[in-house]
């Protein structure tokens, strides 16, 4: 099926690759990206075919050119988006759905591990806390060692108890241990004069996990989780006068309808790219250590000082790797006022910018693709990971209906009108793959 789609739309994909290269510093479309464009072309083709088959309009002779126009829009508009470099792109087959994935969770309360704690998921080994850091689970979940906080009834959960090792991280002496007994139900009796065992104490102990029958076992459960995806619409219409179009063509040599259509599609593309960038920036937790001062120290040239900006980026990359244990960032989002700093940074290679429509690719820095967004807060930057799959993408752009036009309608008074619509959703997959910093004046 995949090869059939690529073969069917190979000519349009060649055009798509040309537009992609113009907006992505000469890069070529990967096989995965070609499949995305081909799938959107196929969805649009099916929609147009069904619409024409059900049509009872009087302008059926124009439908062939209209269909080509619609497919050409997809061919050009989709590859021009920066979405491919920043997030996973996954076309939707219906207007609403779910991104399903499996988490492997604890099925038993044992020590520091609570029932439902995540051991493994597509996103990381473990779960994330509010700051986006991976929470470590009990390394002794399957072992005989248990550390738990005592409740008021002074009863240990895992039995039979062989011996108590520590209380509140303090090892027991032989005399103290000899005066403490634990019955078969885990009830503790403390015969020490100082009453070491109290409610709320953290007790480390060893239980017999070999004898049978076992009262309880550490359990691993598979949990099906899902992220809802619901396509939302963006729509825009063009409206102009037949007389104005005639004058534009006759006096100035350009097609007003084509110009307005190009501007309408460009506006949709700008808003999609901006929404993607805003989503990433909003979900990137700012790290207080990732702050770099632009102010020049005494006796240091601007060239030397600005080159030091790389250090804070490397710190951010290290934090991101340490957080996830397996991912390093591959793109950098910056506010417009940070770009002049990069001109002094060794390793920055500026990209040739042919067409600029909102957020754009400014170049590369030590393997990071650098994107500038006019909507980002001044002096802020974000590093992120995108590998075009669920495990390695912070978010997903899910187009349901690519940019699809209506037919151009002409009215008796000479008014001309045409509409353009798109439907998609943007969902956050993994906030831990984003980290933000700041530049001070």
What are these regions, as identified by a protein language model?
Residues 1-150, 155-157:
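Extended assembly-interface regions of large multimeric machines
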Residues 9-10, 57, 188, 213-215, ...:
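Glycine- and aromatic-enriched membrane alpha-helices
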Residues 63-67, 95-101, 235-237, 328-332, ...:
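Beta-sheet entry/capping signal
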Residues 74-81, 94-134, 138, 142, ...:
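Acidic/polar, low-complexity extended loops/arms that serve as protein-protein interfaces
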Residues 85, 124, 208-210, 221-265, ...:
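Sequence/fold signature of self-assembling virion shell proteins
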Residues 91, 257, 272-294:
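Short, glycine/acidic-rich hinge or "gate" loops at secondary-structure transitions
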Residues 95, 165, 213, 231, ...:
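Active-site-proximal structural scaffolding
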Residues 289-356:
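Extended, solvent-exposed, turn-rich assembly/linker loops in the middle of proteins
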């Amino acid at each position: 099926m995949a090869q059939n789609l690529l073969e069917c739309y190979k000519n349009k994909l060649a055009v798509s690759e040309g537009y992609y290269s113009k907006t992505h510093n000469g890069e070529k479309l990967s096989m995965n990206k070609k499949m995305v464009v081909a799938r959107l072309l196929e969805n649009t083709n099916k929609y147009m075919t069904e619409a024409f088959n059900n049509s009872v309009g009087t302008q059926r002779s124009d439908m062939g050119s209209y269909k080509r126009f619609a497919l050409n829009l997809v061919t050009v508009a989709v590859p021009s988006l920066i979405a491919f470099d920043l997030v996973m792109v996954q076309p939707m087959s219906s207007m609403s759905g779910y991104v399903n994935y499996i988490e492997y969770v604890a099925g038993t309360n044992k020590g520091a591990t609570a029932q439902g704690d995540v051991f493994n998921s597509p996103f990381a080994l473990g779960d994330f806390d509010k700051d986006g850091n991976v929470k470590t689970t009990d390394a002794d979940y399957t072992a005989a060692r248990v550390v738990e906080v005592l409740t008021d009834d002074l009863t240990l959960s895992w039995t039979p108890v062989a011996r108590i090792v520590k209380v509140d991280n303090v090892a027991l002496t032989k005399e103290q241990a000899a005066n403490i007994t634990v019955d078969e139900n885990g009830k503790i009796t403390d015969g020490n004069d100082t009453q070491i065992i109290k409610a709320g104490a953290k007790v480390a102990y060893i239980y017999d996990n070999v004898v049978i029958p076992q009262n309880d076992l550490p359990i691993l459960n598979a949990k099906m989780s899902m992220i809802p995806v619901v396509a939302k619409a963006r729509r825009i219409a063009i409206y102009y006068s037949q007389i104005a179009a005639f004058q534009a063509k006759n006096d100035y040599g350009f097609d007003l309808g084509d110009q307005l259509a190009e501007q309408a599609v460009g506006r949709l593309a700008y808003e999609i790219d901006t929404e993607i960038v805003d989503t990433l920036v909003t979900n990137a937790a700012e790290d207080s250590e990732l702050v770099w001062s632009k102010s020049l120290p005494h006796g240091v040239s601007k060239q030397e000082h600005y080159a030091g900006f790389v250090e804070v980026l490397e710190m951010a990359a290290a934090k991101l790797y340490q957080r996830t244990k397996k991912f390093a960032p591959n793109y950098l989002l910056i506010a417009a006022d940070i770009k002049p700093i990069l001109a002094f940074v060794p390793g920055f290679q500026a990209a040739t910018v042919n067409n600029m429509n909102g957020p754009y690719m400014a170049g590369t820095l030590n393997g990071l693709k650098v994107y500038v967004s006019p909507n980002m807060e001044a002096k802020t930057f974000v590093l992120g990971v995108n590998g075009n799959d669920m495990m390695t993408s912070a978010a997903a752009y899910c187009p349901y209906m690519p940019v699809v036009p209506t037919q151009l309608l002409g009215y008796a008074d000479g008014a001309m009108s045409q509409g353009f619509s798109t439907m998609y959703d943007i969902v956050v997959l993994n906030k831990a793959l984003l980290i933000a910093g700041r530049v001070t004046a």
